[in-house]
């Protein structure tokens, strides 16, 4: 990574604002998945070990630019304190004199500021709000890859006002994605799932420019199958994108691999009657909700030959057990492959976790949307704003 790193900063005695991604699920006042908190710990510990005074800021959920008790950071503070093994002082604000006072009083541990999205200036990247956030600090570190595709005050505005650098997690995310996109060990197999071709058109184009094989599952495969002239029953199809799908298939030839069989049902619900049929025989009124066993085997063969794998998106309606087997089959194959594997997107990551395969993946991305935009070749505002290393 060519950006200035936290390693390049003189930290002793400095007040450092760290943008973390603590947008974690909370139920009944408890954090139910602390992965994102754990992934931020190396940067936090590094800063503390080098004598910095550290305050952390994150968004949580989607509050509408004003305080909402459901999205307070208190449960996150409690879990962070347990994981870090140091005191975490949670403030009920992100700005104002209280922040400066807390930094002056800080002897051990870290400060966690209140939810950045309690302020309307956050999502607008309001200059006055960014200046207020930056005021008490000497340095800024961005370790929130999952929010790097947002041009918000805590990802861009503050970085424009303070000497800024990337944290270890942001570095790691970019290094893995750069490795996949710029110098993959071959064969390079990309796997894409999810519902809509329209959401991933740029990603598909980008991956077809570098991957040896692109395996397409999830509901988006039905737009491709219909574009090939097949009947797809009541399956989800984006008719406006049939022309694009045809163009992509013609350009990719045999590098774009589609399902050969699918699991269909009359309704998308637990307990619905299901059938497994070849893609040429999807019944009228039935919808495809997962890839079938022959497709799992076909995808598996390609995956086991790979030396580099990028996987984003489920192969079916993963939340319903009857339509989860395709995603689980792909997860097991990726784990078995021994390839350098980068996995992103909520359902792909959930499948890996459910099967206990996290340790078998090279890198599990904390940012589904950010990783897709990066793969697509789009600039991530939270990364672009950081100075290049040679500028230091």
UniProtKB/Swiss-Prot annotation:
ATP binds at residues 200, 288, 319, 345-348. It is an enzyme of class 2 (transferase). GO terms for cellular component: cytosol. CDD domains: Phosphoglycerate_kinase. Its EC number is 2.7.2.3. Pathway: Carbohydrate degradation; glycolysis; pyruvate from D-glyceraldehyde 3-phosphate: step 2/5. One of its GO terms (biological process) is glycolytic process. It catalyses: (2R)-3-phosphoglycerate + ATP = (2R)-3-phospho-glyceroyl phosphate + ADP. Keywords: ATP-binding, Cytoplasm, Glycolysis, Kinase, Nucleotide-binding, Transferase. Substrate binds at residues 21-23, 36, 59-62, 117, 150. HAMAP family: Phosphoglyc_kinase. Belongs to the phosphoglycerate kinase family. This is Phosphoglycerate kinase. It comes from Rubrobacter xylanophilus (strain DSM 9941 / JCM 11954 / NBRC 16129 / PRD-1).
